[in-house]
Swiss-Prot record:
Belongs to the radical SAM superfamily. MoaA family. One of its GO terms (biological process) is Mo-molybdopterin cofactor biosynthetic process. It is an enzyme of class 4 (lyase). CDD domains: Radical_SAM, Twitch_MoaA. Pfam families: Mob_synth_C, Radical_SAM. Its cofactor is [4Fe-4S] cluster. Its EC number is 4.1.99.22. S-adenosyl-L-methionine binds at Y30, G72, S123, M194. One of its GO terms (molecular function) is S-adenosyl-L-methionine binding. This is GTP 3',8-cyclase. It comes from Salmonella heidelberg (strain SL476). Monomer and homodimer. Binds 2 [4Fe-4S] clusters. Binds 1 [4Fe-4S] cluster coordinated with 3 cysteines and an exchangeable S-adenosyl-L-methionine and 1 [4Fe-4S] cluster coordinated with 3 cysteines and the GTP-derived substrate. GTP binds at R17, R68, T99, K160, R262, L263, R264.
Amino acid sequence: MASQLTDAFARKFYYLRLSITDVCNFRCTYCLPDGYKPGGVTNNGFLTVDEIRRVTRAFASLGTEKVRLTGGEPSLRRDFTDIIAAVGENDAIRQIAVTTNGYRLARDAASWREAGLTGVNVSVDSLDARQFHAITGQDKFRQVMAGIDAAFDAGFKKVKVNTVLMRDVNHHQLDTFLAWIQPRPIQLRFIELMETGEGSDLFRKHHISGQVLRDELIKRGWIHQLRQRSDGPAQVFCHPDYVGEIGLIMPYEKDFCATCNRLRVSSVGKLHLCLFGDGGVSLRDLLQDDAQQYALEERISDALREKKQTHFLHQSNTGITQNLSYIGG
């Protein structure tokens, strides 16, 4: 086995976020408010199942333990179940998760679980059906809620729910969210609104620090949990009176990048060292044959030497990220 992926700042990388499409059928205000528009970048098509098999095999050989399938909306791929199974061929990968808008979850949760999926994250930015419609552009609140129930029925022990925290939209709804998770094994993760190339005006209007919620949670007796090495960036809190948990993802907080453990590959096979970095390193030419695996691992390892110590969001430098559907948020 090749050596564990490590960068110049001694950070080890156990977690791959793999985008398999940038197409999405929702029009969320903070991501694709005008809907999905095909770009020239996808002219060669998205990664095939065989290419996905090869890239995840290389990352598994380099110490990756967790793969999250992202988009766009991953379940729009007709071969999504085959993709899950292909990633699962790697014994070293212990967790295979998906981030989804949930619109196909009620129909497909059981088949995804059977294919090897171990974790589900569902985007839900409001528990009010009308506000959900206003944020997403889709009147699918009840369908998404049914999907979460279906995930539990399919055998998922916990469901993670992602909620983008927005001032004057949902930041004042903490009590509603807490009541929802009190009897349910849901980890509700509030994600600070992040500035993107296309979303600067929205950011200035609606950004609020997660620190506000953290202070309130601590005041109410919530307890901060320790992170595991392949966990994402959320600070997780639990409370003895709640079955559910709260997570806070605060990319503007000091030292957010110090514990970075994840890399990203786009839906067209580019390795991105940071969600808000520049450029990216193409891997696709080395995904065409199994015999290329050693060269692929070398390219990934070499690229990691260029990973910066931190992002530059504080200077409003969003890198190449025009919207969050591009490399999977």
